[in-house]
Structures are given as C-alpha cells and as structure tokens.
Amino acid sequence: MAVGVHKVTEDFEKELSKYTGAPYVVCVDNQSNALFLCLKYYTIKNNITDNFVVDVPERTYPSVPCEVIHAGGKVNFTEVDGTTICGAYQLTPTNIWDSALSFTANMYIPNSFMCISFTGPYKHLKLSKGGAILLDDLDAYRWLKKARFSGRDECSYHEDDFDNNPVIGWNFYMMPEIATRGLLLIQQFYNNDGTPKYNEDLELPYPKLSNFDLWKGGVK
C-alpha cells in the first residue's frame, strides 16, 4: 500500500481500474516505457534469453519498434492497409497490446497487458505526459510496481527493504502531480447518473517505419 505523497498515484490507479475494468493498473511516466516494461516482463516470465520476434504494424508511433529492440527483441513489420491505424493492436506473439489510441469504459481484455497513453494533444485523457498498464496478473503487477520505481516500494527509501521481492528497476514512476490531474479529469468520462461514458477509438496517420534504416539492425 502506498504511503505519503505516493498515495495519489495509487488513487489514480484505482480510478483507472474502475473505469477500464482492469483488476490491476500500474501508472508510469509514458506509454513507451509501459510497453518496454511489459516486454521485459514477458522475457523474464518466459525465460527468453535469445532474440525474440515481435510483430509491429509498419505504420505506428516510432517508439514501438524502439521498445521491442530495447527489450532484446527483433521487429517484424506487418503490412497496414492505408496510412492510418485505429485503436489498439496486439504485439503478437505476446499478450501485450499497444492501446495508445484507445481509452474507454470496460476496455480491458482479460489475460492481457494493455498499455494506454495520456501523452499528446489527441488522447481522450490528456495529462501532458503519462501512461498506464492494465492487467489481471498479480505476480506481474507486483513486479511492474517495483520495476517502474527503481526497485522501490511506494514509501520512503530510508524505510524500504530492497531485498523483499527484489527487482532491478527503472525510473519510470508517474509523478504525483500528473496523477492528481488525472484524478480530476477522469471524472469527465462519467454521466451525471454515474454511468461511464464510452469513447470512440482514435485513428491517426503514421509514417511507414519499414522504409527507414534506423530499425534495420533490430528487424527480422
């Protein structure tokens, strides 16, 4: 349980859980880092030490193939009809979903890791910067909570026991100021009678990433 200034981030996670239907939510500083953490957990959970291949649409936000490569994988760009993508897509063969273009009531897909985004001018929930992981795996939830916070629990590091469920983590924690904004703005997604509102998936154009040499070293 979070204490002190960290409580507001936990409160925002509970609100996201209520709205999306996900049993657990882990907030991070941006959605790209959410994808990275899920991919890292995928390799740990499945004892993957060699290069693994992940399908990525050839038109998507550029950080997606970057995070696959950072996590030790290789990218298989898949063909996209047209110049846009709409809504969430799965990073097969994993159960990780890039859900940057989706945010709606009861959106959670069971047995998945759904990475949502609050960054940029197009998102339904605009927090300037931020992201979250929706999931229903308790072990993964515990690992991700510590992995996103430099291996820390949500308490003073002077009082932390770093050897309790140890994780070598990263500094991806969502700042309390952002979570506070999220707590205020998420109320717009409820009707006056308290029922949740449903939002249309976003559709955005992206460059054809498979045309660029940048990712060639990490492409299957």
Where are the model-predicted features located?
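Conserved N-terminal alpha-helix of the aminotransferase class I/II PLP-enzyme fold
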Residues: 1-33, 197-220
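Phosphate-binding glycine-rich loop
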Residues: 10-54, 67-71
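Short, acidic/glycine-rich phosphate-metal binding loop used to engage nucleotide
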Residues: 22, 31-32, 79-82, 120-122
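Short alpha-helical
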Residues: 33, 62-63, 139
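Phosphate- and divalent-cation-binding pockets in alpha/beta enzyme and binding domains
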Residues: 37, 63, 143
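PLP-dependent aminotransferase-like
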Residues: 40-107
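Active-site region of PLP-dependent enzymes
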Residues: 103-105, 109, 113-220
